């Protein structure tokens, strides 16, 4: 809490006069500063805020002092000489009023960016219960930047506290940030401050600055079209979504509809369009739609299948569902990451036609039935009946929040969360994002590099470490298509950023979950990011990025990959298992699985189906969890390819 004390005056009239003029004689620190905060060590410290124009302010911290005059616009900014790690200290700003912040530490500050896997809280991880109950770590603090989309760069973040890592509160910390910080502290022994600015479901394009977006011909039109305020943006978004829904379900009104019979056991939906399930509706023509959508399916059952009780498996639903079978409500729940299972009593199903109706409410981000197709089924006494495929669907209601989502347009998240941090010194950035961009993966490579370079400019450090997580394994193994897939291509675009200096990539293909886009193991990723940071800072000699491809060549019917930076040689993740995850292609560009063997620091590939291989790939599928090559230190080999053939996503660009 910012505490404010008026300067003592010896004469009561002067004190009363001062009190009367308090509204005109204010001193404020920026909202990014607060008690329990951590400021960056060994760097000049910028402190800023607002005050009555013309005042002279004195800023003091741990023996450092600066004087500054408030500008005509009421803003002030002071710079203090660098401080070593330590504290707690008191920050004091004095003018016509005094503002003091206690329990200020000096250490390393790391900015956390990206989407929900970076946002994912410690309490929800596989080790959450133990971590949340651990003793207080007074040297670790977090500032969770409130989510706010803005059409113009904001001067302030929305008010939010710095929080000490203590039981009862640490569960809300970014799990990756927490495990990263613990590992860094074990080596460095200094305070760590985390600034969590991640936003679940956010696209890359929302995190770029306006000037950068204007340089991209795909983004520039949307940025130029941004209205002057959030209210106008919300109105435009509402109209855009309504127009999209009207085009998707032509002839079916949206306003004032009576949905009371949409759960009926009858063919009431013959004029409804269809959605594929399991699959989010944003990928099927209903982008940006939050609200209520009904999905209905007519299922034919035999007498044997209809006999007795049954179990309805609905994979997962984002976010809430209500379910009817043959007109009877059988259940409902909320939680985008929860599997849906509903028991159907004997007598509810019938031989012949049966109707399943699901009313889905999406409160933000993706919406619909999603997950593994095998988990969308009806388990009957006579076996399972698949429910995957086309469902009749109709939009009942569109909800447009008064606060637009991060993805309503490019630059919005940057304006609301990153722009207000301008001037703050940070040690580096941790980034986990890309799932939302998998549909236009090829374009991500250039956009990601532009973002890294621009953020370095904004924080005044051209060498600022930028460490990121490569997408984890996800989606059913059965859906893998060798040599293709949006997630596979997005990983390649992420890896392209390693061409920039002072970047590092933590591979996550071995810690994913086929059924959950949010793998619960965040400790491994935090520790891998810490290893990258320690190597970047010169505190770890060995590379922290797994084996690295040095050379490749075709030799007759075989293809040879030679590796370096293996930190103890190549091996499989578990001793004795065959090498998996490699693919070969000939001049026809057809990818087939390859047999593989180790030869020293090389892997030699062959396939009876490819007599003259010209290219190889490894872990190049959406879910490469079966790929099993690691270095001697256990760090996985990242997905790779030796070809430069066009990606499937080439040409797919951002569209409003």
What do these predicted regions represent?
Residues 25-53, 102-112, 119, 276-289, ...:
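Non-catalytic, glycine-rich low-complexity segments
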Residues 26, 32-108, 364-368:
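Ser/Thr-rich low-complexity repeats and stalk/linker segments
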Residues 41-43, 286-290, 311, 524, ...:
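Surface beta-strand/loop "capping" patches
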Residues 48, 272, 299-327, 356-358:
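Aromatic-lined ligand-binding clefts that engage carbohydrates, nucleic acids, or primary amines
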Residues 63-86, 315-316, 324-375:
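Beta-strand-rich ligand-recognition modules
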Residues 65, 560, 565-656:
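C-terminal beta-sandwich/jelly-roll accessory domains of carbohydrate-active enzymes
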Residues 86-96, 357-358, 614-620:
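Short, aromatic- and glycine-rich surface loops/edge beta-strands on solvent-exposed regions
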Residues 99-164, 195-281, 353-424:
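An acidic-aromatic loop/edge-strand motif
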């Amino acid at each position: 809490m910012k505490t404010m004390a008026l300067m003592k005056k010896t004469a009561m009239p002067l004190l009363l006069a001062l009190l009367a003029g308090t509204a005109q004689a204010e001193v404020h620190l920026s909202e990014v500063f607060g008690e329990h905060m951590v400021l960056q060590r060994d760097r000049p410290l910028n402190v800023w805020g607002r005050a009555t124009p013309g005042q002279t302010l004195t800023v003091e911290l741990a023996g450092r002092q600066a004087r500054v005059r408030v500008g005509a616009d009421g803003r002030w900014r002071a710079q203090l000489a660098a401080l070593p790690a330590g504290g707690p200290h008191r920050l004091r700003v004095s003018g016509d009023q005094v503002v003091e912040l206690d329990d200020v530490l000096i250490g390393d500050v790391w900015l956390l960016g990206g989407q929900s896997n970076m946002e994912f809280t410690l309490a929800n991880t596989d080790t959450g219960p133990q971590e949340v109950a651990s003793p207080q770590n007074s040297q670790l603090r977090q500032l969770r930047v409130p989510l706010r989309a803005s059409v113009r760069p904001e001067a302030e973040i929305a008010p939010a506290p710095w929080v000490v890592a203590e039981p009862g509160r640490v569960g809300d910390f970014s799990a990756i940030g927490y495990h990263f910080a613990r590992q860094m502290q074990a080596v460095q022994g200094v305070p760590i401050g985390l600034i969590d600015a991640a936003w679940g479901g956010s696209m890359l394009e929302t995190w770029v600055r306006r000037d950068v977006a204007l340089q991209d011909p795909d983004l520039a039109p949307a940025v130029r079209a941004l209205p002057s305020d959030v209210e106008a943006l919300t109105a435009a978004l509402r109209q855009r979504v309504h127009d999209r829904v009207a085009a998707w379900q032509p002839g079916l009104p949206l306003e004032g509809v009576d949905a009371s019979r949409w759960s009926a056991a009858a063919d009431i939906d013959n004029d409804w369009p269809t959605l594929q399930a399991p699959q989010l509706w944003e990928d099927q023509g209903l982008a940006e739609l939050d609200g209520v959508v009904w999905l209905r399916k007519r299922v034919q059952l035999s007498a044997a299948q209809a006999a007795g009780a049954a179990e309805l498996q609905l994979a997962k639903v984002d976010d809430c569902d209500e379910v009817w079978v043959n007109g009877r409500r059988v259940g409902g729940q909320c939680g985008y990451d929860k599997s849906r299972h509903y028991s159907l009593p004997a007598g509810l199903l019938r031989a012949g036609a049966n109707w399943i109706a699901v009313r889905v409410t999406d409160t933000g981000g993706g919406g619909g039935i999603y997950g593994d197709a095998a988990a969308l089924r009806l388990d009957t006494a006579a076996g399972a009946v698949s429910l995957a495929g086309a469902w009749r669907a109709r939009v009942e209601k569109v909800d447009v929040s008064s606060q637009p989502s991060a993805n309503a347009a490019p630059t919005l998240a940057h304006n609301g969360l990153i722009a207000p941090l301008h001037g703050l010194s940070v040690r580096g950035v941790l980034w986990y994002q890309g799932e939302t961009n998998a549909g236009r993966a090829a374009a991500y490579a250039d956009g990601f590099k532009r973002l890294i370079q621009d953020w370095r400019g904004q924080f005044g450090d051209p060498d600022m470490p930028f460490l990121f997580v490569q997408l984890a394994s996800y989606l059913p193994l059965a859906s893998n298509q060798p040599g293709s897939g949006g997630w596979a291509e997005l990983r390649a675009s992420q890896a392209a950023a390693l061409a920039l200096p002072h970047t590092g990539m933590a591979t996550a293909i071995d810690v994913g979950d086929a059924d959950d886009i949010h793998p619960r193991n965040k400790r491994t990723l935090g520790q891998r990011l810490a290893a990258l940071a320690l190597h970047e800072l010169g505190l770890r000699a060995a590379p922290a990025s797994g084996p690295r491809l040095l050379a490749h060549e075709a030799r007759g019917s075989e293809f040879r990959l030679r590796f370096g930076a293996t930190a103890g040689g190549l091996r499989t993740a578990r001793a004795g298992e065959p090498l998996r995850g490699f693919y070969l292609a000939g001049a026809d560009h057809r990818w087939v699985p390859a047999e593989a063997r180790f030869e020293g620091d090389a892997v030699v590939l062959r396939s009876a189906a490819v007599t003259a291989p010209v290219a190889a790939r490894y872990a190049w599928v959406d879910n490469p969890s079966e790929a099993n090559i690691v270095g001697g230190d256990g760090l996985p080999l990242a997905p790779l390819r030796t070809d430069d053939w066009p990606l499937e996503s080439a040409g797919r660009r951002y569209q409003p």
